[in-house]
Amino acid sequence: MAEISPHARCLACAFPFWEQLTPEEQERLCRFTRPVHYAKGARVHSPLESCVGILLLRSGQLRSYLLSEDGRDVTLYRLFGGEVCILSASCVMDAVNIDLYIDAEEDTEALCISAGIFRQLMQENVYVRCYAYQMTAERFSDTMWTMQQILFMSADRRLAIFLTDELAKTGGTDLRMTHDQMAKYMGAAREVVSRMLKYFAQEGWVRLYRGGVQVLDKKKLQALARGE
């Protein structure tokens, strides 16, 4: 495959529909793709801003969340390098109407695809359209899982799920994260998270240290996460 632009290889790897595009569609997608950088803490998307576009993360981390009128937020999901943020271009999905906020949790490098061009490709190419709806369904599945935990699960089980999920990403036993960060990502009060961590430490499941947690008994946490 001849390289159409410096971004063609990244787009080809990220999007399963790439080979189903015509050469003209591939060229158009590349032409309206640009590199973007978001500093840690930067606002990427909000309901008050225009449609950002589809983001293909190359490095860093984005957090998607809802914000209440009194300033309380609930983290819905996080995205990491290699993942695609489609709800930053929710304007291309006529059936999606959600007041979503997206912030950069770390310095983030990404490729941004024009929302208008992506909408055109969705209308022209059934493979692009199917991909967009599949990705949107996956993000809403993540959102429903988060809401299910908040509404129906006990605090200790939610914390066990969070710890096991985070460690699964790294394959280690240490999680370098403050109690405030854990509470933010879980949609819980900091006091609740601190109390549960202290309980886990008393049981010998974790060791607490400044700025992090070391898991000592992963099997116990996994059993609690499963509701056993």
Could you tell me what each predicted segment is?
Residues Y77-Q134:
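Cyclic-nucleotide recognition modules
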Residues E105-D107, Q123-A188:
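Polybasic "coupling" helices that flank or enter modular domains
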Residues V44-E49:
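Short phosphate-coordinating micro-motif centered on Lys-Gly-acidic
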Residues T164-E228:
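Phosphate-/nucleic-acid-contacting segments
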Residues M1-A39, A89-V92:
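Cyclic nucleotide-binding regulatory module and flanking cytosolic helices
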Residues G41, V52-Y65, F80-G82:
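Glycine- and acidic-residue-biased ligand/ion/polar-headgroup-sensing regions
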